[in-house]
Amino acid sequence: MNKLAVGDADGLVALADEQDSNHLKAQKASEWLLNKGYEIIFPNTAILEAITALKRAKNLPDKAHLINRQYQAGAFLIEFVNDQIQHRASQRFEKTVSKKNTIFDAVVAETAVELNAEYIFSFDGWYLKEGFKLVPENI
């Protein structure tokens, strides 16, 4: 059985944007996961969210298109969200009260459950509150 981590859009955005406050952490976290033999799988929605965030919120269209081209080239391991994941994500989302946590975060969480992933590649503390493990910060 493979060792798995599920990637969130914020991890991917941090890797792509050298000015992101989590850029160095993202580099270290992804290197740590890969060196430990983990595969990082992204829900297809996380790829879409990262592309949108880079283009719209961060005004980095070149980075958005870079991620898109990498997706097209098959550079990412992708888990396409099925009905079960989406339904469970909608149930998890109903329990959230913070406006910072979106349905996309719930999809990442439920993808991690579905795949029995050990880690989530993200910097969002909400996942810790939901009982998931993030990559250790002291690596």
Where are these regions (language model features)?
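Short, well-structured N-terminal submotif of metal-dependent ribonuclease cores
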Residues: 1-42, 56-66, 139
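Acidic, PIN/NYN-like endoribonuclease modules and their adjacent C-terminal/linker elements
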Residues: 1-4, 109-110, 114-139
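Short beta-strand scaffold positions
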Residues: 7, 41-42, 80, 103, ...
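A generic structural signal for short hydrophobic patches within well-formed alpha-helices
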Residues: 12, 47, 127-128
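Short active-site oxyanion
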Residues: 36-40, 75-77, 116-118
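Helix-adjacent hinge/juxtasegments
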Residues: 52-79
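Active-site neighborhoods of divalent-metal-dependent phosphate/nucleic-acid chemistry enzymes
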Residues: 78-118
